[in-house]
Amino acid sequence: MPFIYCITNGNKKIHPSNQLILAALKEQFRDEFQIYNSPDTSAAIQRIHSLQQTCTHLIGVGGDGTFNVLVNGVCSHPNPAFRPILGVLPNGTGNDFYRSAGFQSTHDFFEKIQSGTFDLFDVGKVQTEVETRYFANITDIGFGGAVVLELPSAWTTSKDAHELVE
């Protein structure tokens, strides 16, 4: 039986369609499903580092930044054998990784978890003298975040923007 651990951005409201998916996962997997509302990136990575081999699936509810936190938490995990199946429910601004993974709807995501199927993806590594970071679909040096900050909030929170990934 899989053990599914879900990390959400505790500072962001979860879209209603994702709330339904989380409720369905909780109902199906019961004690094998837990949700952690992370207050920030470092808390999320610390929580991922505390997970053990019993965690078979790690799901983020967010966008590319949330998925990046999952990738960095798993790749920097103290136990290099810790490699749960990663997933993301789109609750971000761009949701590029979710779209590039070929999901047409959050229902597709739910069915993939139920069926136990998954796809492999490449992870890149950037190592400096100060730190090591990992990335799955894109890396930048801060410009991407600046663009998101400049977007009108109506565009990033509108129903139409979320339906782009549903």
Give the label of every model feature segment.
Residues 1-61, 68, 72-75, 103, ...:
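ATP/NTP phosphate-donor binding region
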Residues 63-64, 92:
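Gly/Ser-rich catalytic serine loop of serine hydrolases
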Residues 66-67, 96:
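Short, active-site-adjacent cap segments at secondary-structure transitions
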